UniProtKB/Swiss-Prot annotation:
The keyword Ribosomal protein applies. This is Large ribosomal subunit protein bL36. InterPro entries: Ribosomal_bL36, Ribosomal_bL36_sp, Ribosomal_L36_bact. One of its GO terms (cellular component) is ribosome. Belongs to the bacterial ribosomal protein bL36 family. It comes from the Bacteria. GO terms for molecular function: structural constituent of ribosome. Pfam families: Ribosomal_L36 (PF00444). Keywords: Ribonucleoprotein, Ribosomal protein. One of its GO terms (biological process) is translation. HAMAP family: Ribosomal_bL36.
Amino acid sequence: MKVLSSLKSAKARHRDCKVVRRRGKIFVICKSNPRFKARQR
């Protein structure tokens, strides 16, 4: 999982990517291609 300062580019990497908020952190999850997972500090 990558830690990114901006998730806008991470969301655009794949059409299944979703931005979710968990435990006060913002995550990008991607079910079909989990390699694109990312989070913001």
